[in-house]
Every structure is written in C-alpha cells, then in structure tokens.
Regions:
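Glycine- and aromatic-enriched membrane alpha-helices
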Residues: 239, 243-244
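Conserved phosphate/anionic-ligand binding catalytic regions in large, soluble enzymes, centered on
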Residues: 22, 26
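Glycine- and acidic
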Residues: 14-17, 259
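Extended, intrinsically disordered, low-complexity segments
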Residues: 246-287
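Glycine-rich beta-strand-to-loop/alpha-helix junction loops that act as flexible
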Residues: 206-210
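Metal-dependent phosphohydrolase cores
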Residues: 21, 213, 259
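Alpha/beta enzyme core
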Residues: 3-11, 15, 27-52, 57-76, ...
Length: 287
C-alpha cells in the first residue's frame, strides 16, 4: 500500500538513517526499485519528475502503474509516490492523480511568493493526508532542462518555510544534480548545521545523491538528512549494463532481441545500485 513519506522520514531522522528516493522512468525502473526495497525490508520513495511523468504519458498513468505493481508484486514495505521538483500546477495534477507525496519547488520565485504558494499547497496536501517537501536555495546541475549552480540556502529562509508546517525540507548545501564536476567544492556542512539549528526536528533532504562520497553522505545523515535522492546513478548503471549486452552481441543470439531479455541486465543493474545506496543510507531492515 502506498503511504505518505511523513512517518518513514520521522523514523529515519530519529533513527539516524536516511530513506532513498529513487526516481522512476518506466516499468523496469519501478519494478527493480520495489523488488529491492522488499528484499531488503527498506522503506522507499519513488520519485517522479515532471519530465518523467510526461514521458510515461501523464501522472495518472504513473500512479495507476505504481499502485497496481505494488499490489501485484505483494510489496509490504512502506512506499511513497512523490512528485520531484514540482511546479505549482504540477503539484495539483499529482494530487488529483493519486500521488501520496509532493515536492513544491518554488526556489525560482521571489521568497515571499514561494512562501505564499507553499502555504497554500501545505494546506491542500495535509487536508488529503499527503506529505509535502519544499525547497530553499536551488539545487545545482541540470534536471529536465533546468540548470542551476548549487546555491547554499539561507537558514532563516529555511526556518520561515519549515514553520509553514511542511513535512521535510530540501536545503541547498552546494549539492548538484547529475555528475559532479572535477572542481566541485563538496557539501557545505556549516550551512547544513545552521539550517538544522533553525528547523529543529524537521527531516532534511539531500538532492543530487549521485557521486557524493560515502563519508559525506554519512556526515549529512548525522546532521539531520533523512531523505536522499538518487536518479543519475541508476540511469548510468542501466545504460552501462545495456551497452555491455549489445556490444557482446547478445541481442543477436537466439531471441536476445526480445525486450524482456534486452532490458533485463539494465534492470538488474538498477537493483544493484539501489541495494548499494540503501545499505549506505542505513535503511535496510527498517521497514
């Protein structure tokens, strides 16, 4: 059964581990992540960007697929279906489609407008039993054509957004989406500590989890990060395994061209990546 992300992240914060948000792009992605979460007895958040939602023909299709798959695979661990970096309009579409959690990314609005829109969406989400994440300080890199440099959030602005009653907060601390460049300065733990002081027990979210060294991940968790987003790393694993299968000529052997065979190595690679991350985040056995 799908649930909001509120309880799983409160438990993660209290237990000093993090729950992974793994973004889904299609059936194979969703199935691989759900099966791994079940095998490892880990809670999980399935993230859906607006671009991925559009690719899968719309949020209603995504919600129907995830709900049916959760049931037919016999998944018993907590699963949240979460809109990633949602626009104001996108949040309403996902609420209507049956998502259990939303993220409103108002970081590109003037702060007062971000505050007003966030307030409205918090009320709507909570009235329906959904969890809501908001963002302060844009996350760098590129995601679905949106490019940012990796700003650090203002802790006072974080407090103002947290005080609206959101369930978890994404604060920019120098993290970026996609592959990290060679000249990346690392996570700014001073900013993270200051944000934590301002927002108290609010679970914090680390976007751009791909390529952040394990020691930094563990330190971020010790400072209140309870949700870590991973997308690019699963995509890279999937692409590498699929390339290897085709370069080895396996698609030309027998019925190796059958998509169920062609996509299987990539699906297994996603499982391996998700397992590695769940072990690093400490969520194994926490369902």
């Amino acid at each position: 059964m799908l649930v909001s992300a509120t309880e799983m992240l409160k438990k993660a914060k209290a237990g000093h581990y993090a729950v992974g948000q793994f973004n889904i792009n299609n059936l194979e992605w969703t199935k691989s992540i759900l099966l791994t979460a079940q095998e490892l007895k880990s809670p999980v958040i399935l993230g859906v960007s607006e671009g991925a939602g559009k690719y899968m023909t719309g949020f209603k299709t995504v919600a129907a697929m995830v709900k049916a798959m959760d049931e037919e695979l016999g998944i018993t661990v907590p699963v949240a279906l979460h809109l990633d970096h949602g626009t104001y309009e996108g949040c309403y579409k996902c609420i209507k489609a049956g998502f259990t959690s939303i993220m409103f990314d108002g970081s590109h609005y003037p702060f007062e407008e971000n505050l007003a829109k966030s307030t409205e969406l918090v009320n709507v989400a909570h009235n329906l039993g959904l969890s809501i994440e908001c963002e302060v300080g844009s996350i760098g890199g590129e995601e679905d054509g949106v490019v940012g440099m990796g700003e650090c959030a203002d802790p006072k602005e974080c407090k103002a957004i947290a005080d609206l009653g959101i369930d978890f907060l994404a604060a920019g601390i120098g993290n970026i989406h996609g592959k990290y460049p060679a000249n990346w300065q690392g996570l700014n733990f001073e900013v993270l500590e200051n944000v934590k002081k301002e927002v108290g027990d609010m679970p914090l979210v680390l976007h751009g989890g791909t390529g952040i060294p394990a020691d930094m991940i563990k330190k971020a968790i010790s400072l209140g990060v309870a949700k870590i987003n991973v997308n690019t790393e699963c995509q890279l694993s999937f692409a590498a395994a699929t390339r290897e299968y085709i370069e080895a000529g396996k698609d030309l052997q027998g019925k190796g061209f059958d998509p169920r065979k062609l996509l299987a190595p990539g699906a297994e690679a996603i499982k391996a990546t998700v397992k590695e991350k769940m072990e690093l985040f400490g969520s194994v056995g926490k369902a």
